[in-house]
Each structure stands twice: as C-alpha cells, then as structure tokens.
Design a protein with these regions (language model features):
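PLP-dependent enzyme catalytic core of the Aspartate aminotransferase-like
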Residues: 123, 160-205
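Structured helix-beta-strand junction loops
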Residues: 93-94, 137, 191
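Alpha-helical membrane insertion/targeting regions
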Residues: 85-88, 125, 148, 152-153, ...
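Active-site region of PLP-dependent enzymes
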Residues: 1-112
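Short beta-strand-to-loop capping motifs
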Residues: 22, 115-119, 197-199
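Conserved PLP-binding catalytic core of the aspartate aminotransferase-like
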Residues: 100-177
Length: 205
C-alpha cells in the first residue's frame, strides 16, 4: 500500500485528506470499508454488513480539485527538479551550507528542499537567527522536523494500560532509553533548514 497526503502544503492539495493506493485487493477493500463507516467493500464484509470504521469519505468537490491538478503535476515536478539542481550548485559554493545529497540514480520530487546549516562557519550564529535573516530577505524557511519522540506522544503510549499489558516494564524502559542514542537524528533535526516546495516553482532571477 502507498499513502499520499493532500494537506495544504503538498504538491497537489484539497486542503486536507489523502489517498491509499496498492495492488492487494483484499487490503484495499479493508481500507475502503474502514473509510466508509465500516460498510462492506468488495470481498471484505467483516463480521456482517458493518465492521469497525468511520466517515473518511472525500467530497466530490475535493476530488474534482485534485483531478484538475494532476494535469500539471508532471510539469511542475520537472520545474522543481531543475530549480533544485540550480540551487544546489550555487549553495555548494557557500561554506557552512550543505544541500541535500541524493543517492546515485535517484530522483527527488522535492516536497521540501533541506539543507544543513553549520553555525560554526557563521561565527556561531544560531540556526534560528540564520532563518530569521533568510525570511527578512523574502526566503521562507523553517526548522522542519523535531525529535518527535520527545513530544509526549511516545511517553503516553508507553505508559498506557495497553502497552504495559503487552510488554514488561524492563522492555519498555529499555526502549525509552534507546531513544537517547539517536544522535544522528538529533543532529539532523537541530541543523536542518527547510525551504518549502512552492519556492522551487518560482523564477531563478
């Protein structure tokens, strides 16, 4: 299964919502049932006419907006790629700013253009101050992602009755402690500056 978001920052958007695609008819029928209030779908009937589900049906107006945007998706993706290549070639000349490197023989659609910021090359200027300076020049940017295992949701799950029934206290503690070892993730989250995808649709000059 593949999952796609149509939230308002995405390449094609309906404001909110998303889509699931796949080549497993049984799984797709289950997804269809779940998003349609648990009603039977295809070969999936649950324990009767209704099974567990909710109303996640997309409205026709949203679908029409999305279908119209498909016509320009390929062209806009190519524009993003060319502008990202141009931007990377120029940013590589600036010490302290490192564009994202793509694996060989891969292509990016650039939902986000990330770069690594090295404060040491800017006399210790904090990343937040660097981003404020970019915004002052009309360049939208953000710190993008943070370490989501610190936002309370994980602790809530670990401390829940369900988790504590399934796993021993020792195992849950070991899992929580293991998160302190994700130093690479912490480095990326603290040094990345992200440019939004719509910036790559603009003119170079």
């Amino acid at each position: 299964l593949g999952c796609f978001s149509f939230q308002n920052s995405k390449h094609i958007t309906s404001g909110e919502g998303g889509a699931i695609t796949g080549n497993n008819e049984d799984l797709l029928d289950r997804c269809n049932s779940f998003h349609n209030c648990g009603r039977a779908a295809g070969s999936f009937h649950g324990q009767g006419y209704f099974t567990r589900g909710s109303n996640y049906r997309m409205q026709h107006f949203q679908a029409a907006m999305l279908l119209q945007q498909l016509d320009k998706l390929v062209k806009e993706t190519e524009v993003r790629r060319k502008n990202a290549d141009y931007l990377s070639a120029n940013l590589q000349q600036i010490r302290g700013v490192t564009p994202a490197r793509l694996p060989k023989d891969s292509r990016a659609v650039w939902h986000l253009y990330p770069l690594r910021y090295d404060a040491a090359q800017f006399s210790g200027l904090p990343r937040a101050a660097f981003m404020r300076a970019l915004r002052a020049e009309g360049v939208p940017c953000s710190g993008v992602y943070h370490e989501q295992y610190y936002d309370g949701l994980l602790n809530e799950a670990i401390e829940s009755h369900g988790f504590q029934r399934l796993f021993s206290r020792e195992r849950l503690k070991a899992y929580r402690d293991s998160l302190q070892e994700l130093t690479g993730n912490q480095l990326v989250c603290s040094t990345t500056v992200g440019l939004p995808q719509n910036l790559l649709l603009g003119q170079r000059r």
